[in-house]
Regions:
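Catalytic cores of nuclease domains that cleave nucleic-acid phosphodiester backbones
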Residues: 1-37, 194-245, 274
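Acidic, Mg2+-coordinating catalytic module of metal-dependent nucleases/exonucleases
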Residues: 69-135, 146, 155, 339, ...
């Protein structure tokens, strides 16, 4: 039975599959067990709890509690993972009882659309987002955690404005987290409030700390590269980095290259081409760096190296020499801006970058393109969608360069105020003699 609707009392569920098994029940010489299909490669605790509820509902209907429940993860040749329900029963009953008690003691009017991971795919997300924004919800403060929100509410701080106006030092000792972390989110809320009241994006520079922020900015070099990946984690068993984009200057002229990879062989080739380009460019510009925004790109490079067992020494050289520079890490320790998220797109008003690709068009193109990739139909990708996604990728690469240049201006501003901001040490990426001898 596919998408079987289940109900018992006030509890309802809809299992992906009810599988008939040989076990006598009130239905006859057979009974049913729940099977759920998931996109996640690792089964999470919430999935097991979900299956426990389905199984309990099935048990009420057929007069026999199923012994097992099953999960079909992606790329498993449709072989289910089996979970013995008795192993999780006690915990399930505790969680279910706690939830029921919570609902029984709460006025239905007191429910509130707190942000959760399901918001990303929920049809009510727009309405809930509007309510949170109308209410100046604390979740709109960049970098705040749910634990911090809970503790702030315990002390009567329920909105971003109240947090922005909270006296420092904090008038209480946090039960969870440090005083510094609460001071940090208070200051973040203050800058966001100032930006809203001024009608423009405000920012302030943080005091430099050795090893963080602006002290991690290397000397700009004519050979510097700015790169960004577009990937889809649901293509095949391991995902696909389908566009490797990088931006650089040659003879004073700006260049962008987008290496498309719509299958495994092309992905390997694109990875090798990019690494070879960087290594060859190092011969001409030995002090170049490769800039990116966030940790995705270095992680993707390592995955590709491991997946295809290629360019290990070359990537090792780049990592040892700290050639890769994460500007998100620099920003987090150097700038406090009146934004709700430190996405590079939210920061672009600071450094004056205007995108060529319109984000609504990009979102639609990405959706269509990735559906083709996930459906193993790369030939179905429209040329217009590919062009839109490539412009979007180029925007990300060029925006990263604009951000680096803007950070250099802020660094110089502090230096002119008499603040010392050293450059990071230049490191030779070659392996040590001991490692070289061991490898030989």
């Amino acid at each position: 039975i596919v998408q079987g609707a289940l109900r018992s009392g006030s509890w309802v569920g809809r299992a992906d599959i009810l599988r008939k098994v040989v076990a006598p029940s009130g239905l006859g010489a057979w009974s049913y067990e729940a099977v759920d299909t998931k996109l996640a490669r690792e089964t999470k605790g919430g999935t097991v709890l979900q299956l426990c509820l389905y199984s309990e509902l099935i048990g009420d209907i057929q007069g026999l509690m199923p012994e097992f429940a099953h999960v079909v993860p992606p790329w498993s040749e449709f072989v289910p993972e089996r979970y013995r329900l008795a192993d999780f029963g006690a915990y399930y009953r505790q969680v279910k009882g706690g939830m029921a008690a919570s609902f029984a003691s709460r006025d239905p009017q007191e429910t509130y659309p707190e942000p959760v991971t399901h918001c990303d795919i929920c049809v009510w997300s727009t309405s809930c987002e509007k309510q949170r924004r109308d209410d100046d919800h604390l979740c709109l403060v960049a970098g705040i955690s749910s634990l911090q929100i809970a503790e702030l509410k315990e002390h009567g701080v329920a909105t971003g404005t109240q947090l922005a106006e909270l006296a420092l030092p904090l008038p209480w000792k946090p039960e969870r987290g440090s005083l510094e972390s609460f001071a940090r989110i208070r200051e973040q809320a203050r800058v966001q409030l100032e930006s809203r009241l001024a009608g423009e994006l405000k920012f302030e520079l943080l005091a430099p700390v050795p090893g963080f922020g602006l002290t991690c900015l290397p000397e700009p070099d004519a050979g510097d590269i700015f790169f960004d990946f577009e990937g889809d984690s649901f293509v095949g068993e391991h995902g696909l980095e389908y566009l490797h984009g990088f931006h650089y200057f040659e003879d004073g002229e700006a260049h962008y290259e987008g290496l498309w990879a719509l299958d495994r062989e092309a992905e390997k080739t694109a990875f090798e081409t990019f690494i070879d380009f960087v290594i060859a460019r190092l011969e001409t510009y030995p002090n170049l760096h490769v800039y990116h925004y966030g940790g995705y790109e270095p992680g993707a490079l390592k995955r590709l190296m491991g997946r295809y067992a290629t360019r290990e020494d070359e990537l090792d050289r780049l990592l040892r020499g700290k050639v890769l520079v994460d500007l998100l890490s620099v920003v987090r320790h150097a700038v406090r801006a009146g934004v709700e998220s430190y996405s590079i797109k939210k920061l672009e008003p600071l450094f004056g970058y205007e995108r060529d690709a319109k984000l609504p068009d990009v979102n639609q193109a990405l959706t269509r393109l990735q559906l083709c990739l996930e459906g193993n139909d790369p030939t179905g990708i429209e040329a217009e969608d590919s062009a839109t996604v490539e412009i979007y990728n180029r925007d990300d690469c060029v925006s990263t360069r604009y951000l680096r240049d803007w950070l250099e201006i802020q660094r110089q501003t502090l230096i002119e105020q008499g603040i010392d901001i050293p450059r990071p040490e230049i490191i030779d990426g070659a392996p040590s003699e001991n490692i070289s001898e061991w490898l030989e």
